[in-house]
Amino acid sequence: METRLSIKLFALSALALSAIAAPVLAQPTPSMVKKFDAWGLYSYKGDGGTTCYVLTTPTQMQPADVDHGDNFFLVAPKPSGSGFYPQAIMGYDLKGGSQMTVTVDGRTFALEPKGNSGWTKQESADAALVAAMKSGSSMTLEAVSQRGTQTSYTFSLSGVSAALTQAGRCG
């Protein structure tokens, strides 16, 4: 009797786990299409066709004695096909009510943090930030972790223009 109950519980657990895991496993997996210096062009196929985006990782992270996790700066074409939207993705949750700043060659842009990501506060700032990235050489991102740690990341902008040109042709 006890063995039957254990087998039933195991079978139900496996069924529940597969029901939960199936949607996650069904998500499209991005693959790198091409490397453009510091930036990679990635694509994945979904229900709406092929989606592309460009992504880079920091060349420097501060403070040095903190576990930053995996951090990325991503730029993707807007679904409308007109322009791009930039996004910071951090390896940790950001402090609510804080502000993230992106500085490209002395020009500063504000990002709104939510969870572990940040986007420009106004959609109209997307084009200005992307234009600055295309003409700039380096970008710094400053953020505050949920624990209150001030963090700073430096990204190379080498290759971002070519990567964005290719991303705009994708799909």
PLM regions and their residue ranges:
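Bacterial N-terminal signal peptides that target proteins for export
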Residues: 2-13
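A generic "folded-domain core" signal
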Residues: 25-171
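N-terminal signal peptide c-region/cleavage motif recognized by signal peptidases
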Residues: 21-23
